[in-house]
């Protein structure tokens, strides 16, 4: 499990990288180095490479792949979702279904302004062994983020 929160200059206010073994042991994996891979022209990750160390100092690498990005503030009510603002009461029997064309520039353009949850596939490379896992890969780079090369709210990946 990796949870990282960084300020615009990359300073980490939250840094947790742990491995949980089948027998319940929890191992801290040091200070992970993260490289997010973005789809060109967007802030939507296609995956990440995470380098960490086990408790003995030996290197570990995680290759994370996005299998399905879901901008949770496009129709999900999070953040500044213009269609369903989080917590807005629309009536006792209100029901609605909306369909979004994620290729529409007006829709996908909203992705840069909120968190994106991904169906994530990760492979942990530990020495000569590899192990595959699946889970949530959640990402958001809002505004300036120097480590990603984003100088302001509108900068996107090359």
Regions picked out by a protein language model, each given a short descriptive name:
Residues 1-158:
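Structured soluble/peripheral alpha/beta segments that form catalytic or ligand/cofactor-binding pockets
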């Amino acid at each position: 499990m990796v949870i990282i929160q960084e300020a615009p200059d990359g300073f980490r206010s939250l840094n947790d990288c742990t491995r949980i073994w089948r027998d319940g042991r929890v191992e801290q994996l040091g200070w992970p180095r993260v490289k997010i891979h973005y789809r060109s022209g967007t802030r939507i990750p296609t995956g990440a490479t995470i380098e960490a160390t086990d408790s003995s100092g030996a290197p570990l690498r995680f290759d994370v792949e996005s299998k399905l990005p879901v901008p949770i503030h496009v129709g999900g009510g999070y953040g500044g979702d213009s269609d369903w603002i989080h917590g807005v009461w629309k009536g006792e029997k209100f029901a609605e279904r909306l369909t979004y064309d994620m290729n529409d520039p007006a829709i996908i353009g909203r992705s840069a302004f909120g968190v994106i949850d991904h169906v994530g596939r990760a492979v942990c490379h530990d020495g000569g062994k590899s192990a595959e896992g699946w889970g949530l890969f959640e990402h958001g780079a809002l505004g300036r983020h120097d480590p990603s090369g984003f100088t302001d709210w509108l900068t996107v990946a090359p």
